[in-house]
Amino acid sequence: MSQILPSQDELLAHAAAEPAFAAWLQGHGPLQHSAETRAAVFRTAHQLVQAGLQPDLASVYQLFRALDRLTASALRIVVHMTYARRIRLDGQPLQAEDFKTQPEGHTGGALNMVPAYAGYLALNVLTGKTRAWLMGQGHCVAAIDALNVLTGNLHPEQERAYADGEEGLNRLLQDFYGYAQAPNGAPAAPLGSHVNPHTAGGIAEGGYLGFAELQYAHMPLPGETLVAFLSDGAAEEQRGSDWIPRWWRAEDCGVALPVMIANGRRIEQRTELGTHEGLEGFKLHLRRCGFDPISFDGRDPAAFVCTLWEMEQRLERRVQEKNSGILRYPLPIPYGIAETVKGFGFYGAGSNAAHNLPLPGNPHNDEQARQLFNQHANELWVEPEALELARRLFAEQRGERPLERDNPLALRHPIEPIIPPLRYRDDACSPMAALDRFYTELVEANPDLRARVGNPDELASNRLGGVLKALKHRVSEPESELESVSGRVITALNEEAVVSACLANQGGLNLVASYEAFCVKMLGAVRQTLIFARQQKEVGRPAGWLGWPLVATSHTWENGKNQQSHQDTTFCEALLGEMSDMVRVLFPADHNSALALLPTIYRSRGQLACLVIPKRDRPMVFDAVQAERLARDGAILVEERCGSDPLLLIANGSYQLEQMRRAAQRLAEAGQAYRLVYLQEPGRFRAPRDRWEVEAVADEALVERLFPDSHERRVLLTHMRAEVARGHLWPILPDARRTSVLGYRNRGGTLDEAGMQFANRACWGNVLAACARLMEVPRTALLTPEEAAAVAGKGDPALLR
C-alpha cells in the first residue's frame, strides 16, 4: 500500500497507549500482521474516527481483533466443509468416523477468499454502509457461506438449516457436496458448489471465469458501491476487462472496487502472476490501461479493510479532481492486488493440491492425513467465548444498516418503464427501423433508467443509426458528433465485453445488436445470467431487472456479402434450448411484427429475448392488429385455401415466409388446399419441461386452432437448422412420416438471399418438392420439368429465383 504511513517506533508507542491495538497486533494462528498492514490499520482507524464513522480508536481496534477471530473460524469451517461431517467448536480433534468418505471442495481458492470476504464485511461494519459484492471465482463459495453463517447474514432457508450453532454447522458440512436431491430432482440443500440464489447477497454464479471482470464496472448505479473479487487465473481470460477505465463515469456509474486474489496458481500449474516478474508486469499493464494498482497482503483480512477503504478514498479524490478540471476521463481506477498463496491457512498451501484436496490422503481412512487435518485445523481454532464475542460485536455495530444479503444490487427492481407510442407502418422497410425508433424514444421517455447499448462496431450498418445519433459511442476523446464522453453505447470488437455491459446494467434499459453469426461469442455470458435468474425464480425470489433484446441481425440468410463464417444459426438454436420462460426466441417477419414485440420485452422482469431480425427492407405482411395478435400468441394464420386433404405450411423467419407464400401460390394454382401459418415464437409450441415453462407455452386450444389435427401433412420451413427445429417442435410435427422440415444445412458462401436458399434446399421449389412427397405425387405435378430439374441439382438454379 503506497501511502504515507507511521513509522515502527510510532506504532510501538501507539500500542503502549492503546491496549486494543496491542491486542490486535498479536494476530491469531497463521493470521499475522505485517509492518505495512499494522501501519495501514493505524491510519485507517484514525481516518474512521475523524470522519465520525467510529466513536474512538479502541472501538476500531476491537473490531479488527474480532475480524481476526471470525476469519480464523471461517478458515477452519472451510476445511471442515471439504473433509468433515462434523465440527467440534470445543477444539477437540476429529476421529475417523467424523470425516467424509468422499471429500470434495475447491479448498485453496475458498481459503483465499475468507480474508477477502471477511474484510469486506468488516469494512461495512466500520463505515455503517452496506456495499455489494461480486465474486468471479464462484467455486470459492464455501468462504462466503462460512462467514455468512458466522455473521448471521442468511436467507430464511439457510437460517433454518445452518444458524443453530454446532448442529447447524454440522448440517452445513454434510450438505456441502452432499448431493441430496428433492423428489423433483432438484438439489435438496439450500447450498451449492458455486454462488447461487441461496447465497446471501450473491448476484452471479461466477462459474464462467472472466465474466465478472467484464461486468463489475457496469453494475453499480450512482450512490452504490460494489466490491468485485477477481481471479488471477481469469486475468488470462478476457482482454475486455482491461478496458474498464474507458467505460467508467462518475455521472452514471457507482463506485466499483476490483480486487484480484493473486494466489499464483490455477488448477494444474502456476499462473504468470505466480512469478515476481509476472506480477510486476501485470501492474505495469494495469497502469497502461488506466488502472491504479495497489498491492497488499492478501493473507490478512485487515489489509483488505484498509485497501478497500483507501481505494474508495482515492477514487473519490480522482472524481473531485476531475470536477475541478485537474483530471479528465479516463480516471485512474484503483485496482487491489491481494498477494497470497493458494490455500493459505491450511496444509499444502502453495501446491497444486491446494486447489481441491490439499491433504495427502483422506482423513476418513488415512491416519497421517487425519493427524495433519487436526493439527492445522487446531491452529485456526477460536475459543467459543471469544468467537461469540466477535460475532456479537459485528452484529451490534450493524445497527439499522441492511444486511449484505439485502444490498441494492441483490435487490434490483427498477421502476416500470414508460412505453412510447407504437408507430406501425404500411410500407416496405427494414424491420430494424422499428427497434431503432422505439428504443430511442424509450430511453428519452425514461431518463431515470440508465441506458446501455452493446455494440460490436456495426450499429449503423445494422440500421440502428437513430440509436447511435441519440446515445453516441462512449469515448474519452470524441472525434465526431456520434461520440461523447457521456455516450451510452459501449463499442468494442469484443462481443463478450459489450454484452456484459448490458447484462450487468440490471438497473436500466439495454439493447445489444450484432451479426447473428457473431452472437455465438456471447452465449456463455448470456447463459450464466439466464441460469442464475431461473434459479432465483425457483427459490421464490425472482429477478427484478427489466427484460431486453439480444438482436441477431445481418443474419444467416442475408449475409451472403461475406463468407460462411458470417452464416450461422447457432445462437438462436442454443437459446431455444434454454428455458422458454427465461429467454424468448423470436423471429419477426416485418417492421410491425418486430415493433409489437418490444413493449412486452421491456416490461418483463428477469427475462431476455433473442430477436432474429432482418436488416434489409422487407414488405409489410402484418397490420397492427395482426402484429399484436402474433406477439401475444406466437403464431398466426396468414392465409388458407379450403378443400380436402389440406397441407399445413409453417414458416419460421421472414425470408422463409416469403418462400412459403410463393410455394402456396403454386399450390393454389394446382388446386391443392393448404393452410399457411407464420411461427414467430417456436418456444411457445414446445413440450414444457417443468411447471415454470408451462406458463410460457401456448394452451391446447390455441395449438389446435393454429395447427389443427385434421391437417396431418405438414411442411416447416425454418430459419434454423431443420433438425433443431424438428426436435423442439415435435408437438406440432407429431408424425415424422407425414412431415417435412427444411432449413439451414450448413451451406453458404458469397451468395445472395436466393442463392443461400437454393444452396440449403430451402427455397420455394424445395418446399413444393416436399409437398409433392407428402401428397405422393410427382414433383412435376407442382413444378415444371425445368424447375424440378433445378430442385434435383441437375438444372439452372436461376429458374427458382
At which residue positions do the language-model features occur?
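Thiamine diphosphate
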Residues: 172-190, 201-205, 219-227, 235, ...
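Intrinsically disordered, low-structural-confidence terminal and linker regions
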Residues: 1-51
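Active-site nucleophile and cofactor-binding loops and adjacent substrate-binding regions
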Residues: 98-114, 133-140, 186-205, 231-235, ...
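N-terminal leader/propeptide and maturation segments of large enzyme subunits in energy/redox metabolism
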Residues: 370-428, 771-777, 786-794
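Glycine-rich phosphate/pyrophosphate-binding loops
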Residues: 213-227, 506-523, 677-680, 778-779
